[in-house]
Amino acid sequence: MEKGKGRKEEVVTREYTINLHRRLHSCTFKKKAPNAIKEIRKFALKAMGTKDVRVDVKLNKQIWSKGIRGPPRRIRVRVARKRNDDEDAKEEFFSLVTVAEIPAEGLSGLGTKVIEEEE
């Protein structure tokens, strides 16, 4: 690896637990779900280093499942950095954020996991 390059140039998938309760504290009731989506985008941008962040429909449905005022306190997401196939794309990579399956034991102590691609 070259000095100063970083590891932002490879295709990778990771699972994270995002504490939305901490990020949405002191947020107006009627803005909680939209701000939760924005915070997930911001988290993926920081974790993967790509400006193009795409949120999956199932994740959006889960955030909005209890209405605008009641997004989940914590959510387990799978963030994948993928190569952009469009020729006219500004960015070489994009991030796709999907909802991950939650184990029966709960979310505590899971940490970050690197997922091996099946492709």
Swiss-Prot record:
* Keywords, alphabetical: Ribonucleoprotein, Ribosomal protein
List the GO cellular component terms: chloroplast; cytosolic large ribosomal subunit; cytosolic ribosome
User: Domain of life of the organism in this record?
Assistant: Eukaryota
**Keyword field contains Ribosomal protein:** yes
- Pfam family, any one: Ribosomal_L31e
**In the UniProt record, does the keyword Ribonucleoprotein occur?**
yes
Check the record and name the Gene3D superfamilies matching this protein. Answer: 3.10.440.10
GO molecular function ontology, one term from the record: structural constituent of ribosome
Biological process according to GO: translation
Q: What is stated as this protein's family in its record?
A: Belongs to the eukaryotic ribosomal protein eL31 family.
Q: What is the name of the protein in this document? A: Large ribosomal subunit protein eL31z
**Organism of derivation:** Arabidopsis thaliana
